[in-house]
Regions:
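Bacterial lipoprotein signal-peptidase II cleavage site
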Residues: 24-36
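A short, hydrophobic beta-strand/beta-hairpin element that forms part of a small beta-sheet core
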Residues: 260-273
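N-terminal export signals
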Residues: 6-27
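Thiol-/selenol-based redox modules, centered on thioredoxin-like
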Residues: 276-294
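Short active-site neighborhood of thiol/selenol oxidoreductases, capturing the structured segment around
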Residues: 193-207
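Thioredoxin-like thiol-disulfide oxidoreductase module
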Residues: 238-258
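Typically the conserved alpha-helix immediately C-terminal to a functionally engaged Cys/Sec
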Residues: 211-225
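Non-globular targeting/processing and membrane-anchoring segments
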Residues: 10, 36-193
Length: 294
């Protein structure tokens, strides 16, 4: 059994330190601002867990200052776009770039920038934001054999998730407020047998250690309203009880050590995308369009 302490400490430090991001250029004003037009010293905060493997890698980051993560209404103008390079941390060689990421903030008080990069080798890398420090923020690409959570290209394992008809010992089956969400009508096992694409979210709106689970569920609910006939949408909680002291079986079945995670499969149950830690409805829609599922 995974303890709450192990589960929480296994997650990335959402409010932890990052690399200082310093520029002296004046803000350009409006939503057209870019990373080269920020005027104050900021930090890069990694918004991703250490489960990245070679291939197309998603690298979401946020910006912070000495007072914490920057929000949309915090008085600091946040760039609409960031530009970066990925470099080998040992040699300093640029391996990917330049790449850009748009700001995502739909339904979120703290926006993020989801970079995408094709990194084909195991190792330690840094993401260097234009206008930022020379050391950037670290990225570790792991050997897939060392990662136990389902990866893109692998089959999503069947699991009898709690439903409104059978909570399977999980109470409540959903901590979304003001009432349980509508994504608990079918088990993951049964959904995999339908031969339809699946969006499977594991996260807890009420007890999320990163503060992103409730917005993630709200984003998924928005998407499900449009695609409920062509895809199956399922939500599972992180904890067995509302006391948030016992990790739910759904978490152990996936070997998760962070939250939330959204697994998207094709009609054969193969994971074609996994969004970790932070995402909004716009990014989910973009992913589904890219995958040809919308």
């Amino acid at each position: 059994m995974i303890s709450r302490r192990r589960f929480i400490t296994g997650a990335f430090a959402i409010a932890g330190g990052g690399s200082a991001l310093t520029t002296v250029a004046a803000c350009s004003g409006g939503s057209s601002a870019t990373s080269s037009s920020m005027s104050t010293e900021l930090q890069i905060v990694q918004r991703f867990p250490q489960v990245l493997v070679p291939g197309n890698v998603r690298i979401p980051v946020s910006l912070a200052n000495n007072d914490g993560l920057l929000s949309m209404d915090g008085g600091t103008e946040l760039p609409a776009t960031l530009t970066a390079n990925i470099v080998n941390a040992e040699t300093g060689e640029i391996v990917v770039g330049p790449i850009t990421a748009k700001r995502h903030d739909k339904g979120l008080s703290i926006p993020y920038y989801p970079f995408r990069a094709d990194i084909e080798e195991v190792g330690i890398f840094s993401i260097l934001i234009d206008g930022g420090p020379t050391d950037g923020a670290g990225i570790q690409i792991m050997d897939p054999s060392q990662i136990s959570i389902p990866l893109v290209g692998s089959a999503l394992p069947p699991f009898d998730t709690p439903t409104v008809d059978n909570n399977r010992g999980v109470n409540p089956i959903c901590t979304y407020l003001p009432a349980a969400c509508s994504l608990h009508n079918i088990t993951l096992t049964d959904a995999l047998a339908l031969g339809k694409p699946i969006a499977y979210l594991v996260g807890t709106p009420a007890h999320c250690s990163t503060g992103t689970c409730s917005p993630a569920l709200e984003a998924l609910l928005q998407v499900s309203e449009k695609l409920a006939d062509s895809m199956t949408f399922i939500h599972a909680e992180i904890y067995t009880y509302d006391t948030a002291t016992v990790v739910a079986p759904a978490v152990e079945a996936l070997n998760m050590t962070y939250e939330p995670a959204l697994f998207i499969t094709d009609a054969q149950g193969i994971v074609v995308e996994r969004l970790d830690a932070v995402f909004d409805a716009d990014e989910i829609n973009e992913v589904l369009v890219t995958l040809g599922l919308q």
